Regions:
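Histidine-centered, transition-metal-coordinating active-site segments
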Residues: 1-73, 83-403
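Alpha-helical scaffold segments that flank or form the walls of functional sites
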Residues: 76-77
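Aromatic-lined, polymer-binding surfaces characteristic
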Residues: 80
Length: 403
């Protein structure tokens, strides 16, 4: 069970926080994994729970290291770390969508401080001047630094919760994350940072390998990348049509696509639900581009197909864009809309600067060949074309890569 205090319940029961019930954690992953419909709301509760457990454990080990105030604030920081996410989470966290573009951390801070938002009023009433320390914990400017590292680091309660939750939601049975052993393995260094017991390297290996597999198999899944492209392209096309007075947008869609002075209060009214409703309605429009994207999303029919490439480098893949565009055009399609290029980049484990340290002060990389093998950046490139020319596209790509 997840137990919460009356103060935390009041935060959860604000309209600003309840909005997270309607922001899917994994954007469009449910097209590939039908049960992946969990939300930022449940993830935030889970992060709060893990932070509460970890703070309790550290206070047992270091009775004088954590004040009552910080013991109260750190779990609240975990609870609110994602409160600023846009609809569909990271998928719409881009200036391609928002006319008023800010990262979700910045939006979250504004939602916590803007007097028009109910969350701000509740935090001020409950915490008073401690709101400033709460914000410092969340942005990493507080000392001792382990208070912030619990919330945001390469081994934090955010990642621990979402990886377990995403595994369960997608059914991706890869890797192993032993939450109990990880939480029991954490210590506070003399310098005030969060470190891992040297004899618990293997539990961190399990966590990092699981994260690596989840990016390969879930977060970068081909249907996830394709449907995200459909949504972002739909909104970009809708903005274009609106600017040329060929499409009337709903109030909330105008706030996303055209309002360059979007307030925190108006931002807090944006959820997945209105985006889905608007996009699905566009399936009936006369514009073939917008209706094409919308129809595919509404029906899951007529999807573009991934061009399966032989082994290649990113540089080789980048050189395919122009010849594939020519192929698509010569086949009678519009290359601007019917050739979809998705490029994914993600940092793996990053040692040394912000890395995971052991209790002897060394980076965990030095003690684990397994972690060393998944450090650095991993990336991928995908091309999608109409199904009728997939075979031709694959033949062309193979010829060019093998040259």
């Amino acid at each position: 069970d997840i137990e919460i205090s009356e103060d935390v319940r009041r935060i959860i029961d604000t309209r600003t926080f309840q909005r997270l019930r309607y922001i899917q954690q994994l954007a469009t992953s449910h097209y590939a994994f039908p049960s992946a419909t969990h939300t930022r709301f449940s993830h935030s509760l889970g992060a709060h729970h893990l932070a509460t457990r970890l703070i309790g454990r550290l206070r047992e080990l270091y009775p004088d290291a954590i004040s009552d105030e910080d013991a109260r604030l750190v779990p609240i920081a975990a609870l609110l770390h994602d409160v600023g996410h846009p609809p569909f989470s990271h998928m719409f966290e881009t200036p391609e969508v928002f006319a008023t573009f800010r990262g979700h951390e910045e939006w979250g801070r504004l939602l916590m401080q803007d007097e028009e938002c109910d969350l701000s009023g509740v935090l001020t009433e409950l915490l008073g001047d401690s709101v400033d320390r709460l914000l410092a914990i969340m942005d990493g400017s507080v000392e001792p630094r382990f208070l912030s590292e619990i919330i945001s680091s390469q081994l934090d309660v955010d990642r621990l919760d979402y990886l377990k939750r995403d595994q369960f939601g997608t059914g991706a049975d890869v890797g192993s994350i032993d939450l109990d052993r990880i939480l029991r393995s954490l210590r506070i260094s003399d310098e005030g940072g969060l470190v891992v017991r040297r004899d618990r390297v293997e539990v961190v290996e399990g966590y990092l390998v699981t994260r690596w597999h989840m990016y390969q198999l879930v977060y970068f899944h081909k249907l996830n990348m394709l449907t995200q492209a459909y949504y972002v392209r739909s909104l970009a096309r809708a903005r274009h049509l609106h600017e040329h007075e060929d499409l009337r947008l709903s109030l909330r869609m105008r706030d996303m696509l055209s309002n360059r002075e979007l307030t925190p209060l108006r931002y807090s009214q944006l959820t997945d639900a209105f985006v889905i409703a608007d996009v699905f309605a566009w399936a009936d429009l006369a514009d073939p581009v917008l209706s094409g994207y919308a129809t595919r999303l509404a029906s899951r029919d007529g999807f573009h197909k991934r061009v399966r490439l032989p082994e290649h480098t990113l540089e080789q893949a980048d050189k395919l864009l122009e010849p594939l565009s020519v192929l698509v055009s010569e086949a009678g399609f519009d290359a601007q809309h019917d050739l979809i290029h998705a490029r994914m980049r993600k940092e793996g484990y990053l040692p040394y600067v912000g890395g995971i340290l052991l209790d002897d002060g060394s980076d965990i990389l030095a003690s684990s060949p397994m972690i060393k093998s998944i450090s650095g950046e991993f990336s991928n490139t995908m091309f999608f074309v109409p199904e009728s020319i997939r075979a031709e596209a694959e033949q062309l790509a193979a010829q060019l890569i093998q040259q």
